[in-house]
Amino acid sequence: DDVIITAMNASADTGVAGGTSTALPSGQKTATSDQSDGLTIAKLRSAKYILDNNDVDPSLKRFLVCGPKQVQDLLATTEVTSSDFNTIKALAMGSIDSFLGFQFIMSTRLNKDATHTTDRLTFAFTEDAIKLAIGKDVTAKISERADKSYSTQVYYCMDLGATRMEEEKVVQIPCHE
């Protein structure tokens, strides 16, 4: 998860040889940092507008990765919890599955803004916006070390990386915590 989350906000190496560093453009952010409010319906609508305005195919699955505090912020709004606006009984379930076309993914691994540490950076993105590459799959070995009184030694490794493929399909949403 950390590799994918980092790829959403980090500079992406682009170009034929990957020699150009491309930051997430400011137009792909719903608001500036130093927010005074958490995740709101207005911020969700803004993220949807940014994706729609970029001509992102509406048939692509859209996701929103956010933390527990952002879920709590939305559970306090009528639009999310009322059956008049949402077919899922979010308040009864205590979670949000989907809203405004976004499927919600709750994660405690999201970073805070480096400058404004009271802001959690959440992201809206499409299913093809981030690519994960696995160079070497998981290798795990457990053995004993005779030179260490036959202590158990655990070896575990894998090689992977992720990057943004299309900036216009990722939206950063800073939320106050």
Name each region found by the language model.
Residues 9, 53-54, 86, 111:
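Detector for Asparagine
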Residues 1-20, 55-68, 104, 140-164:
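Long, contiguous amphipathic alpha-helices that act as assembly "spine/axial" helices in icosahedral shell
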Residues 1-53, 172-177:
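Alpha-helical scaffold segments that mediate packing/assembly in large oligomeric complexes
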Residues 34-78:
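Hydrophobic, aromatic-enriched interface-forming segments
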Residues 25, 32-39, 77-177:
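Sequence/fold signature of self-assembling virion shell proteins
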Residues 13, 69-73, 110-112:
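Short, catalytically relevant binding-site loops at active-site mouths
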